[in-house]
Amino acid sequence: MTTQDFLLEIGCEELPPRRLNQLSQALSQTIKSELEKADLSFENIHRYATPRRLAVLVNNLALQQPQRKIERQGPSVKAAFDKDQTPTLACFGFAQSCGVSTAQLKVKKTKKGEFIYCEIEQPGQNTLDLLPNIIQSALKQLPTPKAMRWGDHKEFFVRPVHWIILMLGKDLVPATLLGKMASCETRGHRFHHPKNILVTKPDDYQKLLLTHGMVIADFEKRREKIRDLIQKAASEKGEAIIDEGLLEEVTGMVEWPVILVGNFKAEFLELPPEVLITTMKVHQRTFPIKNKNGDLLPYFIIVSNIESKNPKRVIVGNERVINARLADASFFYDNDLRTSLENRLPKLGDVIFQRQLGTLADKARRIEKLAAFIAKQINIDEQLAARAGLLSKCDLVSEMVYEFPTLQGIMGYYYAFHDKEPPLVAEAIKEHYLPRFSGDQLPRNLLSPCVAVADRIDTIIGIIGINKSPTGDKDPFALRRAALGILRILIEKELSLDLFALLNEAKNNYAVELPNVNVVNQSFDFIIERLRAWYLEKEVPASVFMAVLASHPDDPLDFDRRIKAVQHFQTLPEADALAAANKRVSNILKKQAAELKSKTIDHSLFDSDAEHLLADQLKERAELVNNLYKKADYTKALSELASLKEPIDIFFDKVMVMVDDKEKRENRLALLSSLQQLFSQIADISLLS
C-alpha cells in the first residue's frame, strides 16, 4: 500500500503554558482516533508543542482507504417477489440501482422481517479528500473549556490562529481550518527568526525549525534540554531545586531556552525556605539553588526565551523583581508574627466554610473535638491533638497565606513554633494537609493523622449531610480525594479506627441539624466505595474485595488485613476447592434458612464417620482460629482453615444433607452453618468461586 507522511501544524498566539503538553497529547490522540475510525493505517504519530504552535506528524499514512464490502438493504421479500417468486418491479429497480442482476441479490432475516440485500464492493476514498474533515473532527474534541473567537471568524480555538500547515507528502492539502487557508509555511522564533520557513516535506519539519527557526519543537526534548541546562548552570554554585510542575510550565513558555543565573539579598535567607521557593516560583518562574546540606543559597536560575545581546540586563531585571517580592514576603511574615495563631481564631469566624455548615471557626472547633476523639482511640495525647486541631486553620487568615495559598499549613508550622506551641502540635498543623494528592507522602508522626483524619471526616459528613455528594466527574469539595486520604493514612500508618463510630462522632459535633438523616450510612458507603476504587488501582480482584465486604468490617485497617489474608489464601492449593465448597454450603443454607433457627449440633444424631470427622475438625480448628481472629491474624487463620478441605470433601462425598429425617437434616444443616460461620468471620470465601 502506498503511504506518505502527513503534517499538521496550528500556529497561534501564545498558548497557556500549564496546559500546553495536555493540549498536545489530546490533539495527537484525537487525530489518531479519527484516522483509525476512517480505517486509514499509519506507522506512528509524533507530536510537537511550543508556545506558538501545536503540530502532529503522522508517519507512513495510507493514501487510500482499503476496499470494503457493504450490505445495502432493499425492499422486503414480500414486496420484491410475487406469489410465484418472480421478481417484481421493486426488485428489478433495487438490483439496477446496485448494478447487479436480481439473481445476485440475497435474503436476510431481521427483527422486522425478511428483506433482500446486495453486497457491494465499495472502493476506499483518497486520504487527501478525507483529511480536512478528519482534522476538523479532531479539533472539535480538544479539551478547550476557555476557547476564544477573534476578528470576524466564527471558529473557536484556545488562542487566535495565524497560520496552518496541512501537508501529505510534498503536497498541500487544500483546506481552510480555523479561518486560515492551509499552506506549507511555518514560522520560526518570534524574535530570532520571525520570517516564514518553507517546509518541503513533513519529515523535515522538526529539523527545519531547529536549524532555521531557532525552535526546539519537541516538548519532551525541550523539557529535558532545559533540565540539563539548569543543572549545569547551578553546579557552579550548588544544586538546583527543580520543581517538576514549574519545569513543565517553563517548557511551555519558551521555544529556545537560554539559562541565566541571578542572585538576591542574602538577608532574605532568614525567611522560611518555603517562602523563598514559592516567591521565586510563583512570581518569576525561577529555580532556587541549594548547597550540599540542602540549605538555600542566594541564587536562582532564570529560563529565558531569547539570546539577549545584553544578558546582564535580563538578569538585573529579574533580580530587581525577586528582591522586591521577597521584601514584600518579609513584610508579610513579620506582620504575621505579631499575632499568635490562637489570637487569629476570632478572625476565622469571618470566613465561611460552607453557608449551611458555618464558618472556619466552627470547623476548627469541630476538628478540635474529633482529633481528641481519634487520639483517644489510638492512645495519643488527647490534649495535644485537640490543640493541633483547634489551631490547624488559623494560618488561613494570615497575610502570607492570603498571598500564597499553597503555603497553608506550612506557615502555621512556623507561626506555631514562634508561639512556643509544642513541636508535635506545630508539625501536625503542617502535616494535616497530607496527602494532598494521589501518591503524596503521608504525615510522619502519629499526632498529625488525628488532625488530618478529623479534618477530612468533618468535611465528608458535612457536605454529604447537606446532600451535596459528588456526582459524576463533579466533586467541588474534593470529597473523593479526602476519602482516599483517610484510607491511606489509616491503612498505611496502621491505625485501627471504627469508621462508623468516627462518622457518628463527627455528625454529633455539628451544632446544626444536618438535613440528610442517613448521612452516616451514606458517608460510610462513600468511603468504602473509594476503598474499592483504590484496591482496583492496586489490581486487587473485585471478587476478593466483595468477599471481604460481605463480612462488614468497620475498620479500614482491619479491612486491608482481610484483603491480604484472602489474597494469600488464593495462593494455597486448597483454595479453589474450599471456595467451591463454601459456595455449595451457602446455596444449601439459603434455601433452608427456615430450618436453621437456633439449631445446635447434636453428635448423637450422626450416623456416619464423615459427620464425626467434620464436626471434630471444626471444633479443633474453631478454638485455634478464634484466637487468631482476636489477634487479627487472618492470614494464618485462613491457612489453618485450609486444612478442612479433606473432611469437607469426605462429608459431601459420603453424606446426604437433605434427608427425609427432619432431625438429622436440621443437624447436618447446623453443621454446615457452623462451617460457614467459621470462614465468614474473615470473608465470604464462596464469592471467590
UniProtKB/Swiss-Prot annotation:
Reactions performed catalytically? tRNA(Gly) + glycine + ATP = glycyl-tRNA(Gly) + AMP + diphosphate
**Which compartments is it annotated to reside in?**
Cytoplasm
Name any Gene Ontology BP term.
glycyl-tRNA aminoacylation
Question: Main site of residence?
Answer: cytoplasm
Q: Does rRNA-binding appear among the keywords?
A: no
User: Organism's domain of life?
Assistant: Bacteria
Give the E.C. number(s): 6.1.1.14
Alphabetically ordered keywords of this record: Aminoacyl-tRNA synthetase, ATP-binding, Cytoplasm, Ligase, Nucleotide-binding, Protein biosynthesis
Gene3D superfamilies in the record, alphabetically? Answer: Isoleucyl-tRNA Synthetase, Domain 1
Q: Pfam families from the entry? A: DALR_1, tRNA_synt_2f
What GO MF annotations does this protein's record show? arginine-tRNA ligase activity; ATP binding; glycine-tRNA ligase activity
What's this protein's family per the entry?
Answer: Belongs to the class-II aminoacyl-tRNA synthetase family.
- Outline the subunit composition: Tetramer of two alpha and two beta subunits.
The name this protein goes by in its record: Glycine--tRNA ligase beta subunit
